[in-house]
Swiss-Prot record:
The modification Hydroxyproline is found at P37. Residues 1-26 form the signal peptide. One of its GO terms (molecular function) is structural constituent of tooth enamel. Sequence repeats lie at residues 189-201, 202-214. Keywords: Amelogenesis imperfecta, Biomineralization, Extracellular matrix, Glycoprotein, Hydroxylation, Phosphoprotein, Repeat, Secreted, Signal. GO terms for biological process: biomineral tissue development; cell adhesion; odontogenesis of dentin-containing tooth; regulation of cell population proliferation. This is Ameloblastin. It comes from Homo sapiens (Human). Residues 165-211, 307-338, 353-383 are annotated as: Disordered. Glycans are attached at S112. It is found in: Secreted, Extracellular space, Extracellular matrix. It comes from the Eukaryota.
Length: 447
């Protein structure tokens, strides 16, 4: 019995495994997006689902580069060619573009330049002479008898007032006399009216003048009807605007590389700044290139580093030695030789302020050498370490009870919620008097 039951259970297990395999092949674990196969094509709805700037608080599973850094695309890893060559970025004719980037609907034709057919019944909005010339041009086009006009108009010069008085009330049966009648009709009683038909006798200058005018009016009307068409060829090259801000976050990777439509950037510059106050690595997710900080030294977590180019060459053991406050002369090479280094340090977190790390201050531009621009110089040790009265009104201040050396202030490994208690920088001569153990209530002590 047991020998016969074992293959039966094996068969049942095999059937179960096969059923599970069939189900696993049927259920799409990795659903294919609609688009060009093999390309990372994302529609606007998918980008909205992946996360937008209005949903920053959700910790994104699509990104390992920070808090709200959803949708890090393949451009970051260099796996995709630039977007100009991607077929899903090219415009498709049947696709409806976004409203803010599509050109407006064809405007109605201007009242001064419509097509010539509705001009003839009402001549009120136009000058009489211009209406008469266009009327004559259309009537001559309808008549199509230029040799008859060349013969007839000089013969009828003397009888023009009589013909005008006789033919005007009738329903225009004689076609050759129609241009002369219509032209002299508004200007019959006046002398310029008699002067105008005289050069029209040979009628060549009149014809040569009226025909291009009518054709230009037709061309203008045609251009109005087809108004924004040549620009429509170039407008959908970028269906959604491309925001590529390079911001410094915790790993100093590009903060967000991808296609963002303008509807998803409603927050703009204001919304991420609240997160910049909470998380110091979160500066600079903004649709622009101008305010992005650039970290010269690749920083891991929230570590204060020097802003000088020497920081890129220092090893981590020097940083640890400086962080423990031991008097190491090689840990701070700028201190003795370059006293002007004090003027480059950042004085922004005053005594007791909850401060952002040095390299992640969001709004300040940098010079090409990596130095902060727009910061005031450090107050020397003899000056008042407290804040300005405006800052003291806003923030609660604490006493600066001890002087901290520059390398300790700059290189202390800092928790996200802690700040150095004293930012009063000591002069370079104080290096020998540095204490081995820093008794500071605002730092976590190592055991």
């Amino acid at each position: 019995m047991s020998a016969s039951k074992i293959p039966l259970f094996k068969m049942k297990d095999l059937i179960l495994i096969l059923c599970l395999l069939e189900m696993s092949f049927a259920v799409p674990f990795f659903p294919q997006q609609s688009g060009t196969p093999g390309m990372a094509s994302l529609s606007l709805e998918t980008m909205r689902q992946l996360g937008s700037l209005q949903r920053l608080n959700t910790l994104s599973q699509y990104s390992r580069y920070g808090f709200g850094k959803s949708f890090n695309s393949l451009w970051m890893h260099g796996l995709l060619p630039p977007h100009s060559s991607l077929p899903w970025m090219r415009p498709r004719e049947h696709e409806t573009q976004q409203y803010e980037y599509s050109l407006p609907v064809h405007p109605p034709p201007l009242p001064s330049q419509p097509s010539l057919k509705p001009q003839q019944p009402g001549l009120k909005p136009f000058l009489q002479s211009a209406a008469a010339t266009t009327n004559q041009a259309t009537a001559l086009k309808e008549a199509l008898q230029p040799p008859i006009h060349l013969g007839h108009l000089p013969l009828q010069e003397g009888e023009l007032p009589l013909v005008q008085q006789q033919v005007a009330p009738s329903d225009k049966p004689p076609k050759p006399e129609l241009p002369g009648v219509d032209f002299a009709d508004p200007q019959g009683p006046s002398l310029p009216g008699m002067d105008f038909p005289d050069p029209q006798g040979p009628s060549l200058p009149g014809l040569d003048f009226a025909d291009p005018q009518g054709s230009t009016i037709f061309q203008i009307a045609r251009l109005i009807s087809h108004g924004p068409m040549p620009q429509n060829k170039q407008s959908p090259l970028y269906p959604g605007m491309l925001y590529v801000p390079f911001g410094a976050n915790q790993l100093n990777a590009p903060a967000r590389l991808g296609i963002m439509s303008s509807e998803e950037v409603a927050g703009g510059r204001e919304d991420p700044m609240a997160y910049g106050a909470m998380f110091p690595g979160f500066g600079g997710m903004r649709p622009g290139f101008e305010g992005m900080p650039h970290n010269p030294a690749m920083g891991g977590d929230f570590t204060l580093e020097f802003d000088s180019p020497v920081a890129a060459t220092k090893g981590p053991e020097n940083e640890e030695g400086g962080a423990q406050g031991s008097p190491m002369p090689e840990a701070n090479p700028d201190n003795l030789e370059n006293p002007a280094f004090l003027t480059e340090l950042e004085p922004a977190p005053h005594a007791g302020l909850l401060a952002l790390p040095k390299d992640d201050i969001p709004g300040l531009p940098r010079s090409p050498s990596g130095k902060m621009k727009g910061l005031p110089s450090v107050t020397p040790a003899a000056a008042d370490p407290l804040m300005t009265p405006e800052l003291a009104d806003v923030y609660r201040t604490y006493d600066a009870d001890m002087t901290t050396s520059v390398d300790f202030q700059e290189e202390a490994t800092m928790d996200t919620t802690m700040a150095p208690n004293s930012l009063q920088t000591s002069m370079p001569g104080n290096k020998a008097q540095e204490p081995e153990m820093m008794h500071d209530a605002w730092h976590f002590q190592e055991p």
